[in-house]
């Protein structure tokens, strides 16, 4: 239960930093926000995967916690937070690629940042972490929707009581292949959600590939 609250707090922080990056600031503030976004996203991804791993040992507590969350009217809005954060992160990485600026190398942090920025490691990190945040966000949506229906929306082979691992597997499979693999989608509702996920994943992957091509063509 405690770790789920931590994940929620990280979602909110990540979304807040994502929004703040679009405000007009001096370069140093933008740099701090970029670093914050990367650190929070790392913490979010690691925490989410740890929770998924823990769910295989605490199935009952996971089910109880998910059902409790599903009763909250704001849950659908909360579901959108990591997805929006991932999209805003991708937009930020593209903007940073186009309008990157170096910091005065007066501190060790500035020197390290300029080195990473020069080789576009910052953009690459944001892109990769944003992709994981997007897939995790949809995995949590699949989990909530499926458990609200009594696990009737999705059918996992030889798995009577799916854990969070199953939903992560389903989401990441769609994010990489745009297909549901061996998971059955049983209702129109979940098929609409899968279709939306596939479209967003396709757009995200296309923009990410375009950014990589742009970096290569620029001589990076």
Model-derived regions: residue spans:
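Pore domain of cation channels
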Residues: 166, 170, 185-220
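Alpha-helical transmembrane segments and their membrane-interface junctions
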Residues: 85-108, 174-189
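Membrane-water interface of transmembrane alpha-helices
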Residues: 45-61, 136-148
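Membrane-helix interface/capping segments
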Residues: 48-74, 94-108
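Membrane-proximal soluble regions of multi-pass membrane proteins
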Residues: 146-188
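The first (N-terminal) embedded transmembrane alpha-helix
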Residues: 2-25, 87
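Alpha-helical transmembrane segments
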Residues: 22-47, 118-134
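Transmembrane alpha-helix/helix-exit interface in multi-pass inner-membrane proteins
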Residues: 96-101, 129-151
């Amino acid at each position: 239960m405690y770790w789920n609250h931590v994940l929620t707090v990280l979602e909110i922080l990540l979304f807040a930093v994502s929004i703040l990056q679009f405000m007009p600031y001096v370069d140093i503030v933008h740099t701090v926000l970029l670093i914050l976004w990367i650190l929070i996203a790392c913490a979010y991804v690691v925490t989410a995967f740890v929770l998924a791993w823990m769910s295989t040992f605490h199935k009952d507590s996971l089910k109880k916690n998910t059902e409790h969350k599903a009763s909250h009217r704001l849950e659908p809005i909360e579901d959108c937070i990591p997805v929006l954060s991932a999209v805003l992160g991708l937009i930020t990485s593209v903007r940073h690629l186009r309008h990157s600026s170096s910091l005065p190398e007066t501190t060790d942090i500035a020197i390290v940042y300029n080195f990473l920025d020069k080789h576009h490691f910052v953009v690459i990190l944001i892109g990769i972490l944003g992709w994981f945040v997007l897939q995790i966000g949809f995995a949590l949506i699949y989990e909530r929707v499926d458990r609200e229906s009594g696990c009737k929306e999705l059918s996992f082979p030889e798995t009577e009581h799916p854990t969070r691992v199953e939903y992560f597997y389903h989401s990441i499979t769609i994010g990489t292949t745009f297909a549901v693999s061996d998971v059955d989608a049983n209702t129109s509702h979940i098929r609409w959600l899968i279709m939306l996920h596939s479209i967003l994943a396709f757009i995200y992957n296309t923009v990410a590939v375009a950014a990589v091509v742009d970096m290569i063509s620029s001589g990076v």
